[in-house]
Amino acid sequence: MTAAATFRFLTPMPRLGSGAGPGGDAARWAAELRRIEDLGFHAVAVSEHYSRGWTMDALTAMNFALASTTRLRVMPLVLNNDLHHPAILAKAIATADVLSGGRAAVGIGAGWLADDYRALGADYAAAPVRIDRLTEASQIITTFFTGRPVTFGGRHYRLDGLEALPRPVQDPRPPVLVGGGGPRMLALAGSLADIAGVHARLGPGGFDARAAKGLSRASVNRKISLVAAAASKAGRPAPAIQFTCYDVNVAGVQVTPIRPLFSDFIDAHPASFADSPTSLRGEIGKCVEDLQRWRDELGISYWNLGGNLDAIAPIVARLSAE
């Protein structure tokens, strides 16, 4: 019998506030990162957006978090491939891995939020084109992490003997997460990623009815099966599974602000969400049991339960050693 995967909990990067005086935000932010580390979280998750009030640059925040801690890992969840040249991104992550003693990861997706592209004046190509670019970029990044010179001739990227320096500290490489919700994205994750971020399938505007439907227990099962099938076809072990709970309520504390559309969809289809990992609700003991069951039945080991540390810390304390 295969041993159950170890639980690894992620929490979102703390938001910048309004610290008093020069360095006030930085000091508070560093203290919060160290608190996350001391509570036993595996990693802090960094997202990347350029609209809707998003404050931080992802890579700068990532490096600050690594410099402010000694054990905590940092995992982009996720970077928009269209905003980074893959070779430059791979070099940045490899450098962060070396300087942090092996605590960096790279999480990457095809880009989905049209507002980001509009704000930057960037071309929001059709999804198949964005996924094609991500496929090539992922191949470049994983090759770079081997330390071998990178020569690549694709439709979207071309490299000629690029020196893959520095060589990352982690062996065989910093974890590569590919996140998405559609069949092609899940297949890509299964074929080459170390971690598959299984999520809702988001359209240009974000969370909609299709996304909500795709988070039922049956849909999550199908998504994870697609990842496993792609890994098998590629002749490699299936990647670890990362999942974000959209509705977390621990002992009456609403940890994540549930989206009205999602709430309405759950209320209209209670049977579909009766045992979906999308919604974690109950006292601490019940939440622990649900997470253990979903890990054992679905294989989900990386969990993002939101950023209310006080509410979810007891769960992390109970499960992070398993």
Label every PLM stretch briefly.
Residues 1-322:
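Active-site-adjacent structural elements that line small-molecule/cofactor binding pockets in enzymes
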